[in-house]
């Protein structure tokens, strides 16, 4: 410790060093981004392919299957799922967390290129991919509404102007536009007139396609001039298309306007967005990985006035949802808890030392250690988030411990009359190794967590590094700044000048005396203490096995997601009305601030909602209670169900479901899956541990099965390709031409007019022109019958899959639900051909359950190795670690008492306790070893004297850690769900540990000393009880 004597003797250098640490920390703080949780990027890529008009089964067999075969060969794919619906296929690839997303994207593009030749020729565009981060919810949603512009025009404004400008804002990664589609010219055919005129639908398609072409025409050069050739070969509007001649009948032209209604509309009329139940276009904004979410939202808001000016005045642009208010409030709450924690630990120091000057020393040392941590956080690319700020709050109790141990020991020498400089040098020399052991062993606790891979390792790496950095800086400060300030701020006291003990000091003296007498009794009955310690270890195991467990505390972020599932045969118009009814009911609730949503696309019977709740201080219910109440109010809508889940800051897995957790059934034989899925879903729906049980299996959609008579077709001169073209042209919203404009490209869409497709009689009006030019009705060579057909076909890997989604009701935990599902599937005796596996968050939870015990054991073993190296002993580390069972039982009992499930946050609390509670044992054992080595006294005398002599710093450090964590327990604002489990675990563990380890540690120390000395140990201290009576020390 001679090195640190230089800092005590050079106050200017030490002061400037501390100032430099503080200034760098302040600079780092201003540069740190803000986010709700540490950035955890799941490498997920989604592939999208479309074939308008194709059935889900056709999309699955002709598009999804060849793509899956190609994509499944990519290295590092953990899971591949696909969902094929009407006209579209989505394939989601979840890669290993260590896989670089950019490298994976290149492999995906190569696989798509390789599979291109196997895909149908009629696809309007090649399959494309986009990167997805399932853990990152939208940071802001804007809406566009207008009384004068239609939805297509609003969508055009949003996609061509607003989305481009918002995407250029620093921190924005993606702007998605939803609620409608781009403008288009729609050609709505009249089948009766076409038949009367003898014009086939394919003839109309070819006429339109040939009338609108864009090809280079070239140029003409003369000796003096150059001319470009430009022709009127493009048609831009519906008015331009109406005069097109599609056929001649008796030398009279048949124009498009004669056989169809040609109008300016949108590409997809079966898509709708709403805000508060009224039509709206949605701009969904996501941030870049690692971007400051609050700064990004602020920059977007700064751009809003300019965006308003770029669009017509009759268009209203509004912020419908902003993710940052709850994040701001949560960060403020954690910062408030941090300030309160600092104040409480300083109060603890003042109560024990009763000196303003002595209290000033940790009041300076603690902020220097905490503020300096911001520098390391910035250099490591971390952010200010709930976990990193919680780490600093908890660290408040840790960093003051080092200062307390040094300060208390120097104060003891000053009370003995030693001069300040000498007291500082001697005090650091005596406890320097103790402080070093405390800090290094605490840092060692987090080594396994830092080396851990997967979600848990990624999520808590910032927490661990932030905490270990603050502890490391605290170690430096406690051995440099703290003793230097003691040497120059504190004064020595002559023994005769000591003040009379009174007030809090008198209370502490009484407590110490009681402790001394009780410790003597315990040392005389050590066998009972060892039996109690064994019982505590057994109780720890029982409590850990039986305590309810969950993955992550359920957060109230002020946002809900709504999933609407209607009857599978519902029309788009009816679905839109049901969405409107649901949204109006939700919007009328006093706790709801806004609701927006959309429906349509490949699954007409599905809808999606974003719901913003009022700030927590303006409502008396949490998100889960609001969902329970709304569930009852929304249950009366016939033919449709609305599932609500609270939005979480962390979500595992790339799949989206109608509930928070998923259980997937896989089968190689689709018939097995169809047989067992309803049975399992019904059984799970009856379990009290589950609610909102639903499945993505939709195989009851209404279908009209058309059966060709191939012999008749051959006789009539018609082939299958012509018949299929007829149906696609009539009912598939077929995109038959492209309109090129300076800002965008628009489509010409053709189908039979809606008034002729209200029922199956529309098929009777369809006809084909055969090879002899005659109009042959579809009914001549085909018949049809109603049937059930899937609205979606789902795969996982290359197996047929069906996902059962569920939520967990109040009063139960995720572990309860998983155990109930596993028990039920076993009782049903599901055959081995149908496999059940948990997905998403439930799957990650199962994986973390397996690693939790390993993580705790690894932390204990690491601490043992570090302590063994520091003490050059196999025995003393075991004595120090004997404090852990009492802390564990305190933490688990506290969680049970507060009805809080054991989660990842509680696990971190347990690991922190491993580092905290052993400090008491280190302080006692270190002094006992020193006393035995230098004082030539027996182990019993040494540990007794160490326990009494170090009673005050032990009590001070424990109370400092306890009060540092107390604000987390008592917090009540935004983000409480994350903070309370950590605080409850630490406070419960510290209270129980303080009550028990003051007795168990001396007993274990003596027990190991006897084992080590056996069989030649001496029977020392025969007059121990008589000689030590009254030796309990004093306070001044």
Curated annotation (Swiss-Prot):
The regions listed as transmembrane in this protein's record are: 12-34, 336-353, 360-382, 431-450, 463-485, 528-547, 853-875, 895-917, 949-971, 986-1008
Under Pfam families, the record lists: ACR_tran
Q: Name one GO molecular function term.
A: xenobiotic transmembrane transporter activity
The UniProt similarity line reads: Belongs to the resistance-nodulation-cell division (RND) (TC 2.A.6) family. MdtC subfamily.
Q: Give the quaternary structure.
A: Part of a tripartite efflux system composed of MdtA, MdtB and MdtC. MdtC forms a heteromultimer with MdtB.
Q: Does the keyword Nuclease apply?
A: no
Q: Under which name does UniProt file this protein?
A: Multidrug resistance protein MdtC
Q: Which InterPro entries match?
A: AcrB_DN_DC_subdom, Acrflvin-R, Multidrug-R_MdtC
Organism of origin = Photorhabdus laumondii subsp. laumondii (strain DSM 15139 / CIP 105565 / TT01)
SUPFAM superfamilies hit by this protein? Multidrug efflux transporter AcrB pore domain, PN1, PN2, PC1 and PC2 subdomains (SSF82693), Multidrug efflux transporter AcrB TolC docking domain, DN and DC subdomains (SSF82714), Multidrug efflux transporter AcrB transmembrane domain (SSF82866)
Q: Where does it reside?
A: Cell inner membrane
Q: Which GO terms describe its cellular component?
A: plasma membrane
Q: Name the keywords, alphabetized.
A: Cell inner membrane, Cell membrane, Membrane, Transmembrane, Transmembrane helix, Transport
Specify the protein's topology with respect to the membrane: Multi-pass membrane protein
